[in-house]
Amino acid sequence: MSKVKKQPKIEALQNVDITFTNVSYVYSPKTPYEYTSLQDINVVIKPGKITAIIGSTGSGKSTLIQHINGLLIPTTGVVDTNGFIIKAKQKRIKNIKQLRKSIGLVFQFPEYQLFEETIEKDIMFGPVHLGETKEVARENAKKYLEMVGLPLNYLERSPFDLSGGQKRRVAIAGILAMEGNTLILDEPTAGLDPEGEEDFIKLFQRINKEQNKRIILVTHNMDHVLEIADEVIALKEGRVFKVGSPFEIFKDKNLLQELLIEPPKIYHLIYQLQEKGLDLTNVNIRTIDQLAKKIIEHKEQKRKG
């Protein structure tokens, strides 16, 4: 009789890939409403990186990320998610709390999920529910409230007294307080003003750099993808269409047209420069300052002959 494989501890998961092998997912199978959302997905999401998942509406982005922490079970194929193996049509996932603790999922508009009477209790809820002691959860509430940019005197306030952006920070602090190695963000800047968007993007970068936390970002905002992503997974009609760096994705105008995706604003300028004879599509440019520097360098070279 074979021994049951022990599931890994979170602290041992810092360098573990998330792997999809031949994964498909069908909603409402064998009913008139049957719909195939994912088809034959084979992809690896590396640890310690920021990976963006892009695609037009209905391409399967949200379905894909819900397989990562076991909210959905694949119809076919296998998901190795942080060392937890989830197979097609599996009835239950062993040690599901351990999996959920290792992978935090922040849904779109997470502020609507706040419900406790104080911010401290809201941040503590997830860790305590997943087995953490109240003492440790209370200390982590302080730590992660400060990390998301809110002062400690907010702990005793009601979350319902906060602005929309502040509520979102509290919701993210609650996910971070579970201290997993992976943070999944589904349209995390939706509904925010430009300043609020930029604040959150910088926060995600800081979390990635300071904690070596894997971040998986689902977004329609290609400016954000260009700004922070190490790798991009592009989906089309439930299939992986292309995997590459943001530069490999955005330099290909035909690819973006097939995906029905608008390029980042900087790449609109890069395409215009290309039409005028200055091809910068093979240069890794993330910011307008980097673009300006390359244009100046080109002019200097041209002047010198």
UniProtKB/Swiss-Prot annotation:
The protein's name in its UniProt record: Energy-coupling factor transporter ATP-binding protein EcfA2
Signal peptide feature range: none
ABC transporter domain boundaries: 13-262
Protein residues bound to ATP: G55, S56, T57, G58, S59, G60, K61, S62
Function: ATP-binding (A) component of a common energy-coupling factor (ECF) ABC-transporter complex. Unlike classic ABC transporters this ECF transporter provides the energy necessary to transport a number of different substrates.
EC number: 7.-.-.-
Molecular function per GO: ATP binding; ATP hydrolysis activity; ATPase-coupled transmembrane transporter activity
Entries under PANTHER family matching the protein: ENERGY-COUPLING FACTOR TRANSPORTER ATP-BINDING PROTEIN ECFA2, HEAVY METAL TRANSPORTER
Family, per entry: Belongs to the ABC transporter superfamily. Energy-coupling factor EcfA family.
InterPro entries the UniProt entry points to: AAA+_ATPase, ABC_transporter-like_ATP-bd, ABC_transporter-like_CS, ABC_transpr_CbiO/EcfA_su, ECF_ABC_transporter_ATP-bd, EcfA2, P-loop_NTPase
PROSITE patterns the UniProt entry points to: ABC_TRANSPORTER_1 (PS00211), ABC_TRANSPORTER_2 (PS50893), CBIO (PS51246)
Entries under Pfam families matching the protein: ABC_tran
Record membrane topology: Peripheral membrane protein
Superkingdom as given in the UniProt entry: Bacteria
Gene Ontology CC entries for this record: ATP-binding cassette (ABC) transporter complex
